[in-house]
């Protein structure tokens, strides 16, 4: 039994259509190459996918341009165009293009002079009115852009100010915590000294109870002064003695 005839129609499913296109394209390229080699034929094949991807084949060593030029000559298209254009068609086209570019350049220069206000003596009232409107629109756009940039700068300054304030607060809290910690360490050290002195006093308390004078400070200022006035010198020489005692 032979194969049944397959109906050729567009494949609706995108994935199936893409897979079929890839397979059939490979088969078509293979058949084209075989035909070119077996039959020594010059073949040019151009295929565009639905997404615009180009696939082409041309019989080596020819290029696609050479094959297309041969096709155009075989169809008689190129001679007809040359006969209709004439030998000076290229020169005329270049002259027209240069003229058009000169006119555009001149118009641009005139418009620039008008925008700058350099030469307005030849400008009509209607043109001046239109120019004024254009300048107003341009000025409004410039002002809007300027305000937008100023707003962005203000937002940046606010963010910077917020970050600096946050850093200052963090630094302040850090300094305060360090100061409190140092103060706590000093107070703890002072308490340790007081506790040490109290322990020493408690250790010396039995001795102080047994010897009341133990631990008292002796100051030279509290000692009784010697009575130097109760003593006087006695002369030992006879001539210095009292005459009444001699008699």
From Swiss-Prot:
Tissue: Expressed exclusively in a few inner cell layers of the inner integuments of the ovules.
Subcellular location, record wording: Nucleus
Keyword Hydrolase attached: no
Keywords noted in UniProt: DNA-binding, Nucleus, Transcription, Transcription regulation
Pfam families: K-box, SRF-TF
Function per UniProt: Probable transcription factor.
Protein name, UniProt field: MADS-box protein defh21
Gene name tied to this protein: DEFH21
């Amino acid at each position: 039994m032979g194969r049944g005839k397959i109906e050729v129609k567009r494949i609706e499913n995108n994935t199936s259509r893409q897979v079929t296109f890839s397979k059939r394209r490979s088969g078509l390229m293979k058949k084209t190459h075989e035909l070119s080699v077996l039959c020594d034929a010059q073949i040019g094949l151009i295929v565009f996918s639905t997404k615009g991807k180009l696939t082409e084949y041309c019989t080596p060593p020819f290029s696609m341009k050479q094959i297309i030029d041969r096709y155009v000559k075989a169809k008689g298209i190129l001679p007809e165009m040359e006969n209709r254009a004439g030998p000076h068609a290229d020169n005329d086209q270049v002259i027209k293009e240069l003229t058009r570019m000169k006119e555009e350049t001149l118009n641009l220069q005139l418009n620039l002079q008008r925008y700058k206000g350099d030469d307005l003596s030849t400008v009509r009232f209607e043109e001046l009115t239109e120019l004024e409107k254009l300048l107003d629109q341009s000025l409004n756009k410039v002002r809007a852009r300027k305000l937008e940039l100023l707003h962005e700068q203000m937002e940046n300054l606010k963010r910077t100010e917020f970050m600096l304030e946050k850093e200052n607060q963090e630094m302040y809290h850090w300094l305060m915590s360090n100061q409190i910690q140092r103060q706590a360490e000093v107070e703890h050290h002072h308490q340790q000294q007081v506790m040490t002195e109290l322990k020493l006093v408690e250790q010396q308390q039995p001795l102080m109870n047994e010897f009341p004078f133990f631990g008292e400070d002796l100051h030279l200022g509290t000692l009784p002064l010697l009575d130097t006035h109760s003593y006087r010198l006695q002369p030992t020489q006879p001539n210095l003695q009292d005459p009444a005692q001699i008699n």
